[in-house]
Amino acid sequence: MPRALWTAWVWAVISLSTEGASDQASSLSCDPTGVCDGHSRSLNSIPSGLTAGVKSLDLSNNEITHVGNRDLQSCVNLKTLRLGANEIHTVEEDSFFHLRSLEYLDLSYNRLSNLSSSWFRSLYVLKFLNLLGNLYRTLGETSLFSHLSNLRTLKVGNSNSFTEIHEKDFTGLTFLEELEISARNLQIYAPKSLKSIQNISHLILHLKQPVLLLDILVDIVSSLDYLELRDTNLHTFHFSEASISEMNTSVKKLIFRNVQFTDESFVEVVKLFNYVSGISEVEFDDCTHDGIGDFRALALERTRYLGNVETLTIRKLHIPQFFLFQDLSSIYSLTGKVKRVTIENSKVFLVPCLLSQHLKSLEYLDLSENLMSEETLKNSACEHAWPFLQTLVLRQNRLKSLEKTGELLLTLKNLTNLDISKNNFLSMPETCQWPGKMKQLNLSSTRIHSLTHCLPQTLEILDVSSNNLDSFSLILPQLKELYISRNKLKTLPDASFLPVLSVMRISRNIINTFSKEQLDSFQQLKTLEAGGNNFICSCDFLSFMQGQQALARVLADWPDDYWCDSPSHVRGQRVRDARLTLSECHRTAVVSAVCCALFLLLLLTGVLCHRLHGLWYMKMMWAWLQAKRKPRKAPRRDICYDAFVSYSERDSYWVENLMVRELEHFDPPFKLCLHKRDFIPGKWIIDNIIDSIEKSHKTIFVLSENFVKSEWCKYELDFSHFRLFDENNDAAILILLEPIDKKAIPQRFCKLRKVMNTKTYLEWPMDETQQEGFWLNLRAAVRS
């Protein structure tokens, strides 16, 4: 029994293991190109079953703890491997040995406490390696990257435990496009550790304290293009002139990101600019200045310029003692060579007039997302301020008057490009004054409702997108580019207003359609963006849009942003794919064809009616409907005649001379109704027939060949059908005046043939000796 339990337990474990492997394999999703995605799947190991067809494998953000020698041995064509954000603490020596095609390897944010050069010894073509966020203190006992001669991007270090950089660490690396070192707690930096790298395009350095900053800078200053310093507290930074005074520097750009300064340390940084003479661009991003702007030490140091810095960018500058900040007069003299300044989202409400006047080389000024108003702009753009300024960006400030803003900028004689978007102007005056060289104006998102002659006639580029405009009727003879998206325009602007327009972006309006003629009227138009409108996909519009191959070269957003809004059956379809029916696109032709068909049908119906007596049937139907409305039987007091006689005019002699004599002159006499004698003059014949039949006790039909051919006899017989035969009574008396071939009776007299087959009729005898008996039988039938 214990043996059986043991066997069952073993099989259960094997079954669970198999299911686990199967579940892990199924957790990968791979496309036909060999890209497999397994990130965020709670995997605790690398899935089995990987093949040579896998070229990209993403296993990031899982719970993998170990990478074994055989886990990836089949992935010989793998180029990208992402293992970041796992729990990996062990990587076996030959784990990546078979990945000779690997170009991208991410092992960041795991739990690796030791790094081994054997991992990378066969990765000759590796270009990207990320080892950030692990637990190692150093980069290993031997040179870790000596085999990675093609490496271009390297990220190493962590924010806590990485404390040492040694001279051998980067041996073998000669050129890197990007090197990121996270060493917030760096304690040891061996001189010349980075000097072995002959060229570094971009170095990102995370340092908490600046103690070793100059030592690092000395090693890289001659091989680095772009230095980015992050998360550093420069309160204690002190620049030593002797450190780099004799170095041939190549650094061109310097970025401080999330760095803290004091007044004193800022002075030291400015001194650095003067000695690292290659720096032409400096950026401060999300930095904090713990001071009050007391830079008098710069004057004592006789610092006259910011080195060769021409571009200065400041974003999200935090000044805790903002209301104690001084007037910056001590740095005015340093700004003479600066050509481009960006101060964004830093609560700037004023640029002092003296500072503006000292910015004699300034060509570009961006003061976006600040607190500038017309009152402070008046002081900033004072006389002789920014004499060479060409571009001014005042986006998202507190400007409210377009007219006043234009007047205040008249002092800027060389201004050509003005961005005052995202200010609340609301309206536009009829006239304005602007600098005489204005060519570009950005008024997007300013909530204006209409455009007036306030706009300068010299404009070549105008952006009025994201407003409330419903029309564009301005003449701008030099305008080349118009950006008017996200408004309420219903049609394209008139081309005669914009004779040299080459670019127009008019998407997200309420335009229903445009035509070939409209586009052709813009003779120099090269780019049109008109997607996102509510297009009515008419036949003409679809024919134009789908039939012009050259149109695709003009429409920048074709075909993905062009959708039909109507008709309803094509709503939601792309204009390129919409199809209308023949009747919708050729309405005139279809209507003409239908009319012709109806005419032919009517003509055919008329012919058939004539040949098949259709008109007669319609008349009878109408008479029948009229007769149906009358009472089924007339009251006895309304009976005026003993019999109504239906006969052909050609048989009138027999009726009027023989029948009348034998019936009306008999004693007692019978009263007959004859149409020639008793019909009421002026009354419709059909009404006379109906009334006479209704007021007669019997109806006598004098049947003959003439009767069958008589039109009125047909009417009388039909009405007798409706009133007499349909009621199944004996009010009808048939007299066969002469023999009739039943086959000769027309089809419309079907009831006559039926009656002659089912009812007894009186036949007029040609023998005079039998005629007396005929009259006796007729009188008896009328009297019954």
Curated annotation (Swiss-Prot):
LRR repeat positions: 54-77, 78-101, 102-125, 126-150, 151-175, 176-199, 200-223, 224-250, 251-278, 279-308, 309-337, 338-361, 362-388, 389-414, 415-437, 438-457, 458-478, 479-500, 501-524
Chain ranges passing through the membrane: 588-608
Motif (ATG16L1-binding motif): 761-778
Gene for this chain: TLR2
Stretches assigned to the LRRCT domain: 525-579
Protein known as: Toll-like receptor 2
Limits of the TIR domain: 639-782
Cross-link Glycyl lysine isopeptide (Lys-Gly) (interchain with G-Cter in ubiquitin), where in sequence: K754
Glycan-carrying positions: N114, N199, N248, N414, N442
Primary residence: membrane
Organism, scientific name: Giraffa camelopardalis
Extracellular side: 21-587
Subunit structure: Interacts with LY96, TLR1 and TLR6 (via extracellular domain). TLR2 seems to exist in heterodimers with either TLR1 or TLR6 before stimulation by the ligand. The heterodimers form bigger oligomers in response to their corresponding ligands as well as further heterotypic associations with other receptors such as CD14 and/or CD36. Binds MYD88 (via TIR domain). Interacts with TICAM1. Interacts with CNPY3. Interacts with ATG16L1. Interacts with PPP1R11. Interacts with TICAM2. Interacts with TIRAP.
Sequence similarity: Belongs to the Toll-like receptor family.
Subcellular location: Membrane; Cytoplasmic vesicle, Phagosome membrane; Membrane raft
Membrane topology: Single-pass type I membrane protein
Keyword set includes Signal: yes
Cytoplasmic side: 609-784
An example Gene Ontology molecular-function term: NAD+ nucleosidase activity, cyclic ADP-ribose generating
Purpose: Cooperates with LY96 to mediate the innate immune response to bacterial lipoproteins and other microbial cell wall components. Cooperates with TLR1 or TLR6 to mediate the innate immune response to bacterial lipoproteins or lipopeptides. Acts via MYD88 and TRAF6, leading to NF-kappa-B activation, cytokine secretion and the inflammatory response. May also promote apoptosis in response to lipoproteins.
UniProt PTM: Ubiquitinated at Lys-754 by PPP1R11, leading to its degradation. Deubiquitinated by USP2. Glycosylation of Asn-442 is critical for secretion of the N-terminal ectodomain of TLR2.
Residue runs in coiled coils: none
GO CC annotation terms, alphabetical: Golgi apparatus; membrane raft; phagocytic vesicle membrane; plasma membrane; receptor complex
UniProt cross-references to Pfam families, sorted A to Z: LRR_8, TIR
